[in-house]
Amino acid sequence: MDNPGPSLRGAFGILGALERDRLTHLKHKLGSLCSGSQESKLLHAMVLLALGQDTEARVSLESLKMNTVAQLVAHQWADMETTEGPEEPPDLSWTVARLYHLLAEENLCPASTRDMAYQVALRDFASQGDHQLGQLQNEAWDRCSSDIKGDPSGFQPLHSHQGSLQPPSASPAVTRSQPRPIDTPDWSWGHTLHSTNSTASLASHLEISQSPTLAFLSSHHGTHGPSKLCNTPLDTQEPQLVPEGCQEPEEISWPPSVETSVSLGLPHEISVPEVSPEEASPILPDALAAPDTSVHCPIECTELSTNSRSPLTSTTESVGKQWPITSQRSPQVPVGDDSLQNTTSSSPPAQPPSLQASPKLPPSPLSSASSPSSYPAPPTSTSPVLDHSETSDQKFYNFVVIHARADEQVALRIREKLETLGVPDGATFCEEFQVPGRGELHCLQDAIDHSGFTILLLTASFDCSLSLHQINHALMNSLTQSGRQDCVIPLLPLECSQAQLSPDTTRLLHSIVWLDEHSPIFARKVANTFKTQKLQAQRVRWKKAQEARTLKEQSIQLEAERQNVAAISAAYTAYVHSYRAWQAEMNKLGVAFGKNLSLGTPTPSWPGCPQPIPSHPQGGTPVFPYSPQPPSFPQPPCFPQPPSFPQPPSFPLPPVSSPQSQSFPSASSPAPQTPGPQPLIIHHAQMVQLGVNNHMWGHTGAQSSDDKTECSENPCMGPLTDQGEPLLETPE
């Protein structure tokens, strides 16, 4: 079916395509609005006409005598005699737009159709020059999407908008301009950007014109020269110091983000030499030149929105607490310098040295275990806990009709009749809750949980085992659940009598007052049963139950996450304990290895290879040296020069009575182990020959038995030298 477009006939076409139950629901919803707008009352009358209830529609249209569009509807669709002719009123397009807005709120038409209706209304009012065009524009701005927000021709002049300005309490010193209509005779509508014959680049040739309704809000702080495209020299500008607590208005001609990056990258203290205006142009560099502004009307901004602050602003504030700031306003880069502008906008802002800390190596598990703050953070949940309104698509119904499988048509009729009698938002078990593929008992529980009243449709078919279980389940739920008392209502329809019911069903429900459709006061009983206060109380109870269920699910998920974190923490603690045990074992092995080195024979040494470091005498941890570095200028080893006399020195034995002999141990007892190289001890030798540097010494002689003992007690050879040779002890 073709869409007739946004008109009264199109609105009637939308209503005519709806189902009857949907129209009935919309009729009750619009009729319950006591203080509704004129358009909602007109839409209510149109719904009555779509339902075929012409009498009620005429009564509703009669109450809208002052509405010209309502009179047009009454003349064309309700066959009512009106004083006015069938011509269309001037505000017809606006009323049609409001009607489509109500239909879009009920999801009866797409939002694009509503926007099209407002576009037609804006075009009509603009062509007529109606004084209500501004009010219509504001309404379209609030209700429509961003596609048509603006002038109907596609452009809109600049004007002061009170909604975009901050309240006067934010900055009492700032002046405001009063809004006024555009009265400039030479004002022209805006047009798209287009290239000109100028050789200047587009980036430096863009200009911002002055608004005809908004005057300059602040004065200039310095002398702004013309553009660099002109040949006139620029005047010297000195950066003005601003207190830290104040905020100075900045120009719009330079993007705030780029200006912030330049201020971070340049030094904080910049001295500008004072020169004459004639020498300012050739002396001043491009980086310190004053920013170029438009020749026509430079516009300054007096306030900065707190919501539109870039991330660099917070970084600058944190750095400003550590660095002394001498100037709140950094030197600006001229717009005409394309190369410097591209470099500045593309390069990231320079960070202060305090923020560029060198990365550190991660701590070892032992050091991490010593500080509680270094434990790993608990893993974040991959499935975040959402609100119940986002996870559940169930809605609340004022009543639900529980019925047998053979009574679906009767249940639908009962629901429509109850809605006609003023009980909105009803449902049937087969229509809303009996989802294919789901368990029957689960569907029954959902129907009871998500409804205020449970209506049991008593027919001859309602006598099977499943129906009896439904009765028992509904009764037990009303008795055990808080706030569910008197919520189970047996209903006897016109299609059945009490004699046709099963004895079991009658026995279970004999203690409850029934709702009999055969009764002449059936409508009054329905009104007394389903009161607005009761329905509202049931809705509040349902919301609380859903919130409690959501909180319970969240608590279960959080408990599972807590157990997961506890398991990870226990595993980490066990790992730390095993690491400490392994480290203690390594320490023991190191001590034993050091002892074995101290008990071994000395190894010869040569230049560039140091002796192995023995362990500590008390059994401490051995310290292993690093590998020696090769010397830059190796020196040959120094050997002792032989004596000048040809005969080797004699070895006189000390007398037996000498007190020094008591300090040497006996030959039978082993020498004590000391750290370092051990002395060379020779026993029972008659001749000893030593050779150093191709020289040989010898000593022979017979010794008495007493001398032999004395010789065994006195060591003949001393400890090894640094070159690994035995040291000969000579008498003094």
From Swiss-Prot:
Domain of life of the native organism: Eukaryota
Biased composition (Polar residues): 159-178, 305-331
Residue span of region Disordered: 144-191, 305-389, 603-679, 696-732
Database matches in PROSITE patterns: TIR
Motif position, TRAF6-binding: 84-91, 247-254, 296-306
Skewed-composition ranges (Low complexity): 345-359, 658-671
SUPFAM superfamilies (alphabetical): Toll/Interleukin receptor TIR domain
Glycyl lysine isopeptide (Lys-Gly) (interchain with G-Cter in ubiquitin), cross-linked positions: 228
Residue numbers carrying Phosphoserine: 209
Biased segments, Pro residues type: 604-615, 625-657
Record carries keyword Cytoplasm: yes
Deleted gene: phenotype: Mice are viable but exhibit abnormalities of the innate immune system.
Ranges for domain TIR: 395-534
Main subcellular location: cytoplasm
Residue window of motif pLxIS motif: 206-209
Protein name: TIR domain-containing adapter molecule 1
Organism of this sequence: Mus musculus (Mouse)
Lineage, highest ranks first: Eukaryota, Metazoa, Chordata, Craniata, Vertebrata
